[in-house]
Amino acid sequence: SVGFKAGVKDYKLTYYTPDYETKDTDILAAFRVTPQPGVPPEEAGAAVAVESSTGTWTTVWTDGLTSLDRYKGRCYHIEPVAGEETQFIAYVAYPLDLFEEGSVXNMFTSIVGNVFGFKALRALRLEDLRIPVAYVKTFQGPPHAIQVERDKLNKYGRPLLGCTIKPKLGLSAKNYGRAVYECLRGGLDFTKDDENVNSQPFMRWRDRFLFCAEAIYKAQAETGEIKGHYLNATAGTCEEMIKRAVFARELGVPIVMHDYLTGGFTANTSLAHYCRDNGLLLHIHRAMHAVIDRQKNHGIHFRVLAKALRMSGGDHIHSGTVVGKLEGEREITLGFVDLLRDDFIEKDRSRGIYFTQDWVSLPGVLPVASGGIHVWHMPALTEIFGDDSVLQFGGGTLGHPWXKAPGAVAXRVALEACVQARNEGRDLAREGNEIIREASKWSPELAAACEVWKEIKFEFEAMDTL
């Protein structure tokens, strides 16, 4: 029929297309949808597709001026969720033309924009995204890559060790630098600014950068190893952030840091570009992620935030510990850890991976395990994360009864013992405690650490189960 037909029509007539063959260039999304009572799955799934792509709530005259078939999002498959009567997974395909090249901000504004406030839905969670190769290639991604980082640091065949300086707020710059020096001298590879250390009245950023650089060079001279401190460049404006990164580069330090969710993807991508151009490694902290990813039925799963970070750029990202004080179910965590590190990841629903993802030549990101871990966790961490990871012991280093440097020694000895045992073919999962006990016989620092944290366990059920 010719002409324009006004009025509201069912979304599913246009946007639910179960026979659609997805294209290699489509961005694919898996949403966990909880519709309001009485809204059928096809209609709810189609509603998600329309509201996150071309449509609005009614037909409009200007629809006739465009090719809807070319630009519309399509809900192409719906599957039930085991054990959840009210939820289902809706798969939506978006044509690549809907997205600006090289912009995570634009991708998210479309896919997880207004649609999350949609009345016909009780709750909505983005579980996974398949980023097509054609779109991946429009991003620079991480400034360096895992191999490049190892070459810069001259550290091979083991995880890297870090430590967040505590108390996180209140130290003067000089005392802060002293804590950095003690940890690095004792055997850590990195120390870290806490995510909320920016430039507060008690310690302005420039003073901190200076004293930390002094600590790094002093520790390097003493140990003969390359050291680093994640200088947090996060700031109130992008210009100020870049100014801090420039100062770090002038000091000659190896690495800076950014809070990518609070700082925002636009700022993060700018910083990642600066870091690649100037040879700085970039450590990424995920402060605020739990606001977005912790609820099972609403929000965005962390694996999507991790993919977005790999596109935006970062060399390290915090990704949970599986064993410490923060959320993380083992299989799910390993799923997004591999998404960060590997070039190609097969679809595997047992690990929460809904789509096969090919990253082509985008560099990988080192996962950082941090939060409530100590020397007794070392065998499990080495086993779970493997060599390509950063293990961060904040309280687990600084809380050592003989203070920071011995705390660092204990952590390094435990790590080297675990790596050696693994290389000799021992089973870390089964013999972990035994390996640590043996090592502590010839390291008084480790023995003292083992004594303090004998039986600490954080026993809660993880909320993020499949």
Swiss-Prot record:
What would be the name of the gene that encodes this protein?
Answer: rbcL
| Miscellaneous | The basic functional RuBisCO is composed of a large chain homodimer in a 'head-to-tail' conformation. In form I RuBisCO this homodimer is arranged in a barrel-like tetramer with the small subunits forming a tetrameric 'cap' on each end of the 'barrel'.
**Does the keyword Transferase feature in the UniProt annotation?**
no
**After translation, how is this protein modified?**
The disulfide bond which can form in the large chain dimeric partners within the hexadecamer appears to be associated with oxidative stress and protein turnover.
The GO terms describing molecular function are:
magnesium ion binding; monooxygenase activity; ribulose-bisphosphate carboxylase activity
- What's the protein name? Ribulose bisphosphate carboxylase large chain
Cell compartments where the protein resides: Plastid, Chloroplast
Q: What is its main location?
A: plastid
EC no. given is 4.1.1.39
